[in-house]
């Protein structure tokens, strides 16, 4: 193990000088024992100097401090010892429950599985959320993105998915909190504890208040733990909240590393950094990783380079809309913008496909008629269009649903709707079976039976 000295500190970026014959490799972990700080090598600048990112606060560092090269990249504990624990980017416990007691450690920088090892699946994963199961169904072993601006419900939707899938699914889950609020991580921990599934979840947090190095690498730490479970032949759920903060952390250190910024100030290596992470989130012939990732959309602009780069890697995209949220319809999923590769008659079946397409057609027609209604009013529409508008408004209302995780805010109990009930309800709406029921009966309802019951009470 060679030793060097700190020669420059610029925020999260630290330059360290080593003897010329013992320069560390890129991604090697260096340790400053006096400060208890780990650095990760990013560049070799020549003359024995390496440029590193600090995996913690660089406050109090000064030139001349001794740095030790560990000789390998950052390693984190993996396996069953991580379940029920909260760890930081280095795999150190932060839940005050004693040491992890790991049997094995993995390096966080690993190759993606080779093509012949990867497997594709068409098995559907039921979520119990009507709008998702209908228009953008998830695949087991697939990658899903929840796209939305600030405050439209990404985290609440993700928590509901965790509630519905992780509890029903007997497998293991890994939750990577990347640059999000500490409060949300705290709530998540207690929620898992209350529901009795804490012993099946490993949690890795690098919150908003942490230096960019932590936020840049914490997603890889969580992914490494998920890969271990997958390689043991298990089916794993990987939740990442929020993938945008991963990009943002890269942007924060990019300029300090001396790279020229690209579009909108993002790092020039944006696509490559996203690819390195996303290509590893995949299912193999031994086990599967099903990932759900929240993606913040800056200024509600889906063409921003960060969300646009993420789109390319996903099997299903759930787009949350501010306009739908402003109507009071939650989950605020846009059924016209959300897509899924699974929405194919050969995968979901002809009936499901026809109902989903029918719902989208009716909503699209309503969208086109809104301008005419705003200018001329409903009376100028043909009878056929009036029927379409009435059904579209009922469909819009019926796409809302009370969530289990929002019970404390809404006061109404959460509802889980099975896929067959979802299809039956929307099929009836399209065929005019429920034209006699007032649209208010459809708002925040579970299955169609509940809607009929409400209408009969009135």
UniProtKB/Swiss-Prot annotation:
<dbReference type="Pfam" id="PF02874">
    <property type="entry name" value="ATP-synt_ab_N"/>
</dbReference>
<keyword id="KW-0547">Nucleotide-binding</keyword>
<dbReference type="InterPro" id="IPR024034">
    <property type="entry name" value="ATPase_F1/V1_b/a_C"/>
</dbReference>
<dbReference type="GO" id="GO:0005524">
    <property type="term" value="F:ATP binding"/>
</dbReference>
<dbReference type="Pfam" id="PF22919">
    <property type="entry name" value="ATP-synt_VA_C"/>
</dbReference>
<comment type="subunit">
    <text>F-type ATPases have 2 components, CF(1) - the catalytic core - and CF(0) - the membrane proton channel. CF(1) has five subunits: alpha(3), beta(3), gamma(1), delta(1), epsilon(1). CF(0) has three main subunits: a(1), b(2) and c(9-12). The alpha and beta chains form an alternating ring which encloses part of the gamma chain. CF(1) is attached to CF(0) by a central stalk formed by the gamma and epsilon chains, while a peripheral stalk is formed by the delta and b chains.</text>
</comment>
<keyword id="KW-0375">Hydrogen ion transport</keyword>
<protein>
    <recommendedName>
        <fullName>ATP synthase subunit beta</fullName>
        <ecNumber>7.1.2.2</ecNumber>
    </recommendedName>
</protein>
<dbReference type="InterPro" id="IPR055190">
    <property type="entry name" value="ATP-synt_VA_C"/>
</dbReference>
<dbReference type="GO" id="GO:0045259">
    <property type="term" value="C:proton-transporting ATP synthase complex"/>
</dbReference>
<feature type="binding site">
    <location>
        <begin position="148"/>
        <end position="155"/>
    </location>
    <ligand>
        <name>ATP</name>
    </ligand>
</feature>
<keyword id="KW-0813">Transport</keyword>
<dbReference type="InterPro" id="IPR003593">
    <property type="entry name" value="AAA+_ATPase"/>
</dbReference>
<dbReference type="InterPro" id="IPR020003">
    <property type="entry name" value="ATPase_a/bsu_AS"/>
</dbReference>
<comment type="similarity">
    <text>Belongs to the ATPase alpha/beta chains family.</text>
</comment>
<keyword id="KW-0067">ATP-binding</keyword>
<dbReference type="InterPro" id="IPR050053">
    <property type="entry name" value="ATPase_alpha/beta_chains"/>
</dbReference>
<comment type="function">
    <text>Produces ATP from ADP in the presence of a proton gradient across the membrane. The catalytic sites are hosted primarily by the beta subunits.</text>
</comment>
<dbReference type="InterPro" id="IPR000194">
    <property type="entry name" value="ATPase_F1/V1/A1_a/bsu_nucl-bd"/>
</dbReference>
<dbReference type="GO" id="GO:0005886">
    <property type="term" value="C:plasma membrane"/>
</dbReference>
<dbReference type="InterPro" id="IPR004100">
    <property type="entry name" value="ATPase_F1/V1/A1_a/bsu_N"/>
</dbReference>
<keyword id="KW-0066">ATP synthesis</keyword>
<dbReference type="InterPro" id="IPR005722">
    <property type="entry name" value="ATP_synth_F1_bsu"/>
</dbReference>
<dbReference type="InterPro" id="IPR036121">
    <property type="entry name" value="ATPase_F1/V1/A1_a/bsu_N_sf"/>
</dbReference>
<dbReference type="InterPro" id="IPR027417">
    <property type="entry name" value="P-loop_NTPase"/>
</dbReference>
<keyword id="KW-1278">Translocase</keyword>
<dbReference type="GO" id="GO:0016887">
    <property type="term" value="F:ATP hydrolysis activity"/>
</dbReference>
<keyword id="KW-0997">Cell inner membrane</keyword>
<dbReference type="Pfam" id="PF00006">
    <property type="entry name" value="ATP-synt_ab"/>
</dbReference>
<dbReference type="GO" id="GO:0046933">
    <property type="term" value="F:proton-transporting ATP synthase activity, rotational mechanism"/>
</dbReference>
<keyword id="KW-0472">Membrane</keyword>
<keyword id="KW-1003">Cell membrane</keyword>
<keyword id="KW-0406">Ion transport</keyword>
<keyword id="KW-0139">CF(1)</keyword>
């Amino acid at each position: 193990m060679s030793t060097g000295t700190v020669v420059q500190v610029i925020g999260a970026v630290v330059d360290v000088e080593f003897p010329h014959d013992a320069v560390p490799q890129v991604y090697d972990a260096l340790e400053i024992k006096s400060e208890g700080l780990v650095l990760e090598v990013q560049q070799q600048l020549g003359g024995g100097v390496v440029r590193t990112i600090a995996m913690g606060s660089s406050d109090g560092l000064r030139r001349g401090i001794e740095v030790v090269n560990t000789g390998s990249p950052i390693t984190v504990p993996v396996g069953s010892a991580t379940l029920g624990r909260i760890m930081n980017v280095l795999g150190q416990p932060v839940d005050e429950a004693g040491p992890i007691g790991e049997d094995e450690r993995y390096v966080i920088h690993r190759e993606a599985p080779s093509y012949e090892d990867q497997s594709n699946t068409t098995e559907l994963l039921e979520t119990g959320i009507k709008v998702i199961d209908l228009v953008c169904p998830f695949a087991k072993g697939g990658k899903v993105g929840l796209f939305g601006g600030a405050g439209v419900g990404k985290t609440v939707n993700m928590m509901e998915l965790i509630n519905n899938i992780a509890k029903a699914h007997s497998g293991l889950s890994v939750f990577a909190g990347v640059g999000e609020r500490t409060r949300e991580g705290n709530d998540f921990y207690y929620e898992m504890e209350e529901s009795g599934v804490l012993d099946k979840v490993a949690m890795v947090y690098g919150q908003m208040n942490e230096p960019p190095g932590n936020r840049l690498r914490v997603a890889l730490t969580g992914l490494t733990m998920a890969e271990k479970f997958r390689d043991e032949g298990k089916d794993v759920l990987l939740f990442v909240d929020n993938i945008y903060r991963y990009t943002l952390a890269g942007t924060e250190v990019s300029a300090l590393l001396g790279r020229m910024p690209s579009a909108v100030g993002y790092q020039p290596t944006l696509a490559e950094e996203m690819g390195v992470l996303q290509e590893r989130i995949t299912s193999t012939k031994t086990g599967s990783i099903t990932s759900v990732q929240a993606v913040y959309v800056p200024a509600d602009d889906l063409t921003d380079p960060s969300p646009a780069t993420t789109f390319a890697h996903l099997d299903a995209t759930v787009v949350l809309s501010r306009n739908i949220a402003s109507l009071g319809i939650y989950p605020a999923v846009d059924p016209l913008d959300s897509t899924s590769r699974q929405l194919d008659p050969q995968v979901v079946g002809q009936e499901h496909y026809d109902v989903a397409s029918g719902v989208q057609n009716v909503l699209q027609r309503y969208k086109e008629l809104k301008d005419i209604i705003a200018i001329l009013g409903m009376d100028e529409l043909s009878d056929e269009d009036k029927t379409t508008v009435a059904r579209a408004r009922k469909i819009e209302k019926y796409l809302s649903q009370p969530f289990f995780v929002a019970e404390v805010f809404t006061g109404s109990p959460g509802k889980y709707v099975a896929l067959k009930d979802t299809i039956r309800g929307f099929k009836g709406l399209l065929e005019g079976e429920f034209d006699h029921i007032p649209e208010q009966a459809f708002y925040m309802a579970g299955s169609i039976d509940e809607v009929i019951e409400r209408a009969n009470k009135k």
